[in-house]
């Protein structure tokens, strides 16, 4: 079996363990994400596309460019960021959101901190619109992501029709337009729903966040798993400081923050309340 430190002969571009290690360092510096050795093939596949576009022949040259070119740093992070999502993924979170909104009708602000291609913030918006019975509720929904490319897709709000098949019929009818002609097989989020969500680029590793507070609800699902424990605690601490005392913090199914009792306390399955 070929070891990671060896150059794989059949690959289009020379790619060594040293290259992988440098990719890992650069990604951690720019986004705070640590790469496991098992991500070797994924790194090669995604970054090889950038080498082809830039007409480069060596990973070494590409990584030199990344180190000194701000625009390419953005492409680099975008290429290596995993974006897996769907409408109403982990549905118990949206049931909890609906209940919370009914119990706290005066909330003002919801932050979806890992928007990806938009399915999560639009699921939040559908829940908010349903509870308040209007597309103009007194709630601001801000959706951020480090990946500017996926935010463009999110703002456009165009998806495969297959992606909404699992939604209730009245949701499909109320919140989506069916595509016709060249757009057959696609759907677009209703304009009224799209206007409920503000999409912005934000890196959770940045020393400052351009996000208004106080925040009543934070969705930060399946993001912290990419950070080491020290980084997790720092980000969670910063988020909690932005929240209202009765706020709701929603984590991903594989994330557990019970080891931070000084920051949050459980109030449901992967749902927490800030300790203020």
PLM features: what roles do these ranges have?
Residues 97, 218, 243:
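Residue-level signal for inorganic ion chemistry
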Residues 117-134:
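Conserved SAM-binding loop of SAM-dependent methyltransferases across substrates and taxa
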Residues 233-245:
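A short glycine-rich, Lys/Arg-flanked "PGG" loop and its adjoining helix->strand segment in the class I
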Residues 107-121, 140-142:
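Conserved class I S-adenosyl-L-methionine
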Residues 246-253:
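Conserved beta-strand signature within the Rossmann-like core of class I S-adenosyl-L-methionine
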Residues 217, 258-276:
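Core SAM-dependent methyltransferase catalytic element
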Residues 2-111, 252:
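Conserved AdoMet
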Residues 109, 134-219, 223-231, 256-258:
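Extended basic-aromatic, gly/pro-enriched interface segments that bind polyanionic ligands
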